């Protein structure tokens, strides 16, 4: 039991280390390797919770450690990717005087990710689904967007405004009350899992067609749209 109880927290620490490595690559402008380490961190994040359930071990420190690791991997790392991207964009003449300060706005993503994780820890409604955009989904969206569309993003002197508008939307979604489905299964049957299986299949198709790095922003966009449609249908 002595070793077994430390396994989930050890996996969580691997998530944290992955986030630190992702952040270092993001700072030097290597968004692709940063995204790679975010994906690795997401894998560790998936298995730390699974291992805790399978081994039937839990501790108060585990939940707090998981949130701290998640904010580094899914908050600080993607914020740094956006920071580096905003640093290399062109800015119109009137903003040249403050262009060195604009990239730091990207770190609002880390702050709102921390708020989202704190809210998740206290919210008893999020056992089988999510309320607000999960931080891993947000991180994968931003990392993939920057990796797959540099020419499109850097195409005009107003690309920064588009990215900042998207940043504002994603920060709002992180702490919003929008219900979002989760890939959490109580059983493996088709009934009650139709949306989850269809989304998983669609995600796999996107990964095959667009590539393991480029597909994620499309997948997360579909996830968001699907959640909104399900919410509207439930309200109707």
Identify the residue ranges that each predicted region occupies:
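Helix-coil boundary and interhelical linker segments in multi-pass alpha-helical membrane proteins
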Residues: 21-36, 78-104, 145-162, 209-213
């Amino acid at each position: 039991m002595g070793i077994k109880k430390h396994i989930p927290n050890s996996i969580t620490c691997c998530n944290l280390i992955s986030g630190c490595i992702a952040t270092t690559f993001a700072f030097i402008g290597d968004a692709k390797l940063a995204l790679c380490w975010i994906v690795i961190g997401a894998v560790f994040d998936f298995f730390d919770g699974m291992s805790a359930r399978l081994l039937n071990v839990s501790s108060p420190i585990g939940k707090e450690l998981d949130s701290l690791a998640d904010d580094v991997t899914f908050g600080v790392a993607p914020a740094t990717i956006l920071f580096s991207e905003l640093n290399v964009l062109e800015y119109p003449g009137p903003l040249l005087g403050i262009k060195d300060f604009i990239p730091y706005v990207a770190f609002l993503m880390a702050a709102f990710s921390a708020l989202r994780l704190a809210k998740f820890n206290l919210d008893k409604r999020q056992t089988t689904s999510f309320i607000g955009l999960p931080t891993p989904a947000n991180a994968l969206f931003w990392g993939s967007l920057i990796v797959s569309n540099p020419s499109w993003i850097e195409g005009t002197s107003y690309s920064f405004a588009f990215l900042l508008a998207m940043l504002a939307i994603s920060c709002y979604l992180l702490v919003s009350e929008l219900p979002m489905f989760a890939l959490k299964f109580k059983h493996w049957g088709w009934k009650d899992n139709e949306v989850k299986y269809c989304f998983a299949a669609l995600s796999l198709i996107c990964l095959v067609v667009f590539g393991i790095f480029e597909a994620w922003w499309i997948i997360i966009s579909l996830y968001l749209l699907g959640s909104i449609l399900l919410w509207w249908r439930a309200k109707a």
